[in-house]
A protein has these predicted regions:
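Bacterial N-terminal signal peptides that target proteins for export
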Residues: 1-8
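C-terminal motif of bacterial Sec signal peptides marking the signal peptidase cleavage site
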Residues: 15-18
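Intrinsically disordered, low-complexity repeat and linker tracts
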Residues: 20-34, 268-293
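Structured interaction patches on ligand/partner-binding surfaces of diverse proteins
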Residues: 22, 84-89, 111-149, 238-267
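Short amphipathic, basic-aromatic surface patches that mediate peripheral association
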Residues: 24-28, 32-59, 165-168
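Conserved "repeat-terminator" motif of extracellular CCP/Sushi domains
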Residues: 33-34, 151-158, 221-223
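Tryptophan-paired
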Residues: 60-118, 174-255, 287-293
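A sequence/structural signal for flexible, mid-protein segments enriched
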Residues: 127-214
Length: 293
C-alpha cells in the first residue's frame, strides 16, 4: 500500500506539472539579479553630470529609475535589471556572460514604471507610465575570459515642450489634458530616435486660481528636429470638456521649447509666435526656444 500511495503521489505531481502553463511576461518583470559576474556596468555620469551628484538631488530633479539590458547581436534579450532610487546597488549592475559579443543598453528616467525592453530597436514607454527626461547608453561590447567593468556615460535623447499657463485656472476646470502627435513614445536604442508614430497623452489635475502653472511634455523625435501637433483640453470634475486649443510646436532633440501664454483668455483666437531665440546653452540642455501662444 505504501508503494501504491507513493506511486499515485508521483503521478499526481507529474499531471499537475504537465497542466501548468509557463508564464511569459512582456512587461519586463523578468529580472536578472546577479551579485557576481564577469561584466559590471557602472554609471559614471548622466548628460555630463557626475552620477553621485545627480543622485543627491531631490527626487523631482534626479532620475529615479535605471534599466540595464544585455542582448545578443541578433537583438534577443538575455539579461535585464531594473533599479530604483534608494536601492543599495543603484547605478551598478553585474552580469555573468559567456565569451562573445553583446549589446549593452542602459536607461535613466523618472517614469512611473519600467519601459518594455524586449527589443532594443523598440524600447517603449506608454501613456499610463508617463514620459519623462530619458538618458541612454548603447554599445556593443566583447566579453572575454577576464572580468571587466564598464563606466557608462548616458546622454539625453528626449525633447521637451515646457507649457506655461500665465493666467489663473478658472473656476470649474479640474483637469488639463495634453495630447500631442509628431513624436514617439518609443525609441530605437541604436540611434536614440523615435521609432513609431505615437499619440502621447499627459493629464494633470488642477485647481481654480492656480497661477503660472507649468507642464512638461517629453517626446522622442524621429530625427534631430521635428514638430508636434499639440492639443490642450480642459475638463470639469465630471469629465465634461469645457474647451480645447490646438497649436504647432517646433522641437529639437536635447532642447527645450517653452510655450508661454494666457490659456483661458481669448481662447478663440489663433495662436501666434511672438519671437524665437536659442539661449542658455549649458551642460543640461543644448538650448532653449521661447514662444508665446
Amino acid at each position: 500500500m505504501k508503494y501504491i500511495s507513493h506511486t499515485l503521489f508521483v503521478l499526481l505531481l507529474l499531471m499537475l506539472a504537465g497542466c501548468e502553463k509557463p508564464i511569459i511576461s512582456d512587461t519586463d518583470t523578468e529580472e536578472t539579479v546577479e551579485k557576481k559576474g564577469n561584466l559590471t556596468l557602472t554609471i559614471s555620469e548622466v548628460e555630463h553630470t557626475p552620477f553621485p551628484e545627480l543622485t543627491r538631488k531631490s527626487a523631482s530633479e534626479a532620475c529615479n529609475r535605471l534599466n540595464f539590458a544585455v542582448y545578443d547581436t541578433a537583438g534577443s534579450r538575455l539579461k535585464l535589471t531594473h533599479q530604483k532610487l534608494g536601492d543599495a546597488d543603484f547605478g551598478t549592475a553585474t552580469f555573468q556572460l559567456p565569451e562573445g559579443t553583446y549589446i549593452i543598453v542602459a536607461l535613466a528616467h523618472s517614469s512611473n514604471g519600467n519601459p518594455t525592453m524586449t527589443n532594443p530597436e523598440k524600447i517603449q514607454f506608454n501613456n499610463s507610465q508617463g514620459y519623462t527626461d530619458t538618458f541612454l547608453y548603447y554599445k556593443k561590447v566583447v566579453v572575454g575570459t577576464e572580468s571587466q567593468t564598464l563606466s557608462l556615460s548616458l546622454h539625453r535623447i528626449t525633447s521637451l515642450c515646457r507649457f506655461v499657463v500665465n493666467d489663473a485656472i478658472p473656476e470649474g476646470v479640474a483637469k488639463l489634458e495634453f495630447t500631442y502627435k509628431g513624436g514617439s513614445g518609443s525609441f530605437d536604442a541604436s540611434t536614440g530616435y523615435g521609432c513609431v508614430n505615437s499619440t502621447q497623452v499627459m493629464k494633470y489635475d488642477v485647481q481654480a486660481d492656480m497661477k503660472q502653472t507649468q507642464y512638461d511634455l517629453y517626446t522622442f523625435l524621429h530625427s534631430t528636429e521635428g514638430s508636434l501637433h499639440l492639443k490642450v483640453t480642459a475638463y470639469d470634475a465630471s469629465g465634461n470638456m469645457l474647451f480645447e486649443k490646438s497649436m504647432g510646436v517646433d522641437m529639437y532633440q536635447n532642447q527645450i521649447t517653452w510655450l508661454k501664454g494666457n490659456l483661458f483668455s481669448d481662447i478663440q483666437s489663433t495662436p501666434t509666435e511672438s519671437f524665437s531665440a536659442t539661449v542658455d546653452i549649458d551642460t543640461q540642455w543644448q538650448g532653449e526656444l521661447y514662444f508665446t501662444y
